[in-house]
Amino acid sequence: MPDMLGTGLSSLRALQRALDTTAHNIANVATPGYSRQDVQFDTRRPSVVGSNWIGNGVNVSEVRRIYDQFLTAQSRSSSGNLARLDAFATQAARLDNMLGDTTNGLSASLQGYTDALSEVSSTPGSIPARQVLLSEGRALAQRIVAYDGRLREMSADIDTRFAGEASEVTLLAQGIARLNGEITVAAQNTGHAPNDLLDQRDRLIDQISGKVSVTTVNEGDSINVFIGNGQPLVLGVTASEITTVTDPFDPERTQFALLTSSGTVDISRGVSGGTLGGLLDWRREMLEPARNELGRISLAIASQVNAQHREGMDLTGALGGDFFSVGGVGVTDVTTNTGTAVVSATRTNVAAITGTDYVLARTGTGYTLRRQDTGAAVTFTGTGTALDPILADGLSIVAGAGAATGDQFIIHPTRDAAVGFKVAITDPSRVAAAAPIRASAATSNAGNGTISTGEVLNATNAQLLTTANIVFTSATQYSVSGGPAQTYTPGGNIDVNGWRVQIGGAPATGDTFTIRSNAGATGDNRNAIALGDGLGAGVLDGGTTSVASAVARLTADVGLQTRTAQVNRDAEAVVNEDDLAARDSVSGVNLDEEAAAMLRYQQAYQAAAQVIAISSTLFDSLLNAVRR
């Protein structure tokens, strides 16, 4: 039966809930992930009085969570993408700052070495000039080794960060599982899920998404979270653990695994998005290519300088040796191999060396070779034995006996080159600035024939420094050191004992031209000039890219990638800001609206209190009337 007091009391209770909820909204205006709550009122069932229905007041049917699943998912996705791009751009900037140092960078060190070569060319007999060349060579080597060390440190830093991020993801997953349990129990007891716990759970999912991309599936009052290629991170009240393990393909690299009740699952290839995805992308797209390219540049410098230096002569009269040395080709056995084969590799042609690693895999009948970066198959010759090595992309690969089907080996052509880069000579007198041979025409020659200075074709020829005489037996024929007669072609190549000369003009019968060792020619700078010219010649990419161009390209590529990453990050930040604003426009707390609601509920509450007061007055009047 309706009564004024009951109606007023129901109103007071409902409005008290509304005021409490509004105050709760205001209190959480700055709480990340908080969704605004709104009290839903329902009219109480009316009572029949006579022939009329009289109302009985109001009930609170629900404290509703103002939530849009689409907007939440959209903002979560853009936040995760922003975290990925920010992690990539931040690491890219570190790499760019290192390689782009114009004062102490690789280009500056290379220029210092080139300038020292020019000084030796100007004063080839100067010991101080040669000493400066060695010093600049060491400075260049130290810069390359330092860069390689810094890149390795960056890789180690990333691995350390991976371990920390994996632990945080595990803790967040455990928090979600715990909240799943609490929400389920609360919903079963009251019929409604607790809004604040739902917000907390969504907040944890947002935080995980900021670290790694995940997908969610609702199951009752719980949310299941999946990572990678669909591996379960959270199932109901059970959370799996993410950990870091050593990559079986590379002991220097860390990858991710999921520890579940049924065992360990490799999820590395499926990890994307968030901070972890950004770091993985940066390692794959920038860090590892930069390390390989730095090694390739080291190979180019050593190959070009050494080849020319071996064709020169030092102050002691000896042929030049290697000026620089580099690290060898690295080979890594995959940890899952079951065979006993030992694989080794050497470089045969620096011009054909690429900046990628390779995977050599044993099949039932032989081997396959593919690029590790793209997975593309590589054409090769040979079977892999010592007498018939596998030849591909400037490499010679020998696989020993004992490989089992499925065994894999990772070939690193350039990665270890930089760490072993150093100057191979210490004595300045051993700098081979001079050409090893000199050619001259006899002063008694009657003709007007001239001879070139000569060039070395094969510095390993045992007869290279043996004196040879070219004697013209007629105007059209000559012999070399008493050998058979040969037809004279003006300007034609004469190749003997590993050297080459050209004779021009019109030699007369009996004219003699002599090629001999250049020992003692301290003023000869021909090989020093050739050493400097060689650094500008093509040596990489099939002989089309010079050392200087390779250094400039590495710096430019890293700079371009960095700027692109920063632009992408800034653009995504705008998208994320819009997505968050769209979410907040629905779920966020608007203080103006809450203040208006508070005032409205306050006035209604006061009116309800007045209803109760009037009801009390009427009741008192009735009692007084009865007493009379």
PLM feature segments, named:
Residues 1-628:
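S/T-rich, low-complexity, solvent-exposed segments of bacterial secretion/appendage proteins
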